[in-house]
């Protein structure tokens, strides 16, 4: 977090003020954010479908109102209950790693504010998303419904165990750090499918991992980049 952002963030925290922006101003900030994400991606830029999704999804609708003017900064932001909305660069990277197709069925573990689910829903056919923190999950479900994401199915529950009755999934995205790849999720991943999951100890450096299930059922893993996520809660 740079000092200008920290200073402005602190001022909002102190005064509790909200500075409204117009739709055109938010649009301009969103386009700028996407350009910055592409530039920061280096040799691994997001593809056209991910770029289009992030250009469309209004991130300011997925953060607390008093943080809406910061929604298009390339930073994670608090969303309550000790959780955060991920940095846009990481959202783009994780989504790109899934290599989604328009007919795919995706499982997301950790709905949070619903932003990542909305990005996925702009690309895939159906998104199933699970949140263990009930108030957060209920807020996200209402938000996604109000924004017209009818292809997103939400549930309150322990994401470690996945969504067995909706399995198998073409892709699985875990938005909290686990100590290991959850076996129930691996079981629910289709042969030929991809899972993206951060692995590592809570609040320490973790690594974003790409897990690929081969057509014969064997599994390969690839370490992508160091990251820092809130810990996965629940059964694991």
From Swiss-Prot:
Subcellular location: Cytoplasm
InterPro entries, sorted: PCMT, SAM-dependent_MTases_sf
This protein's UniProt keywords: Cytoplasm, Methyltransferase, S-adenosyl-L-methionine, Transferase
One matching Pfam family: PCMT
PROSITE patterns, sorted: PCMT
Top enzyme class: transferase
GO (cellular component) term, any one: cytoplasm
Family statement drawn from the similarity comment of this UniProt entry: Belongs to the methyltransferase superfamily. L-isoaspartyl/D-aspartyl protein methyltransferase family.
NCBIfam families assigned: pimt, PRK00312.1
Name recorded for this polypeptide: Protein-L-isoaspartate O-methyltransferase 1
Gene from which this protein is expressed: pcm1
């Amino acid at each position: 977090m740079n000092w200008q952002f920290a200073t402005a963030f602190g001022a909002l925290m102190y005064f509790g003020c909200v500075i409204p922006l117009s739709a055109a101003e938010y649009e301009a900030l969103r386009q700028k954010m996407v350009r910055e994400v592409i530039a920061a991606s280096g040799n691994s830029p997001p593809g056209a479908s991910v770029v289009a999704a992030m250009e469309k999804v209004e991130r300011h609708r997925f953060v607390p109102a008093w943080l809406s003017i910061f929604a298009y900064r390339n930073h994670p932001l608090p969303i309550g209950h000790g959780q955060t909305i991920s940095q846009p660069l990481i959202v783009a990277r994780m989504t790109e790693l899934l290599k989604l197709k328009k007919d795919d069925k995706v499982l997301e573990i950790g709905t949070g504010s619903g932003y990542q689910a909305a990005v996925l829903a702009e690309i895939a056919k159906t998104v199933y998303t699970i949140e263990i923190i009930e108030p957060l999950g209920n807020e996200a479900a209402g938000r996604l419904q109000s924004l017209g994401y009818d292809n997103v199915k939400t549930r309150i529950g322990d994401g470690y165990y996945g969504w067995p009755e909706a399995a198998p999934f073409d892709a699985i995205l875990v938005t909290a750090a686990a100590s290991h790849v959850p076996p129930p999720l691996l079981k629910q991943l289709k042969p030929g499918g991809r899972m993206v999951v951060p692995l590592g100890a809570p609040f320490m450096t973790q690594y974003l991992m790409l897990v690929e299930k081969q057509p014969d059922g064997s599994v390969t893993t690839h370490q992508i980049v160091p990251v820092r996520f809130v810990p996965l809660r629940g059964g694991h």
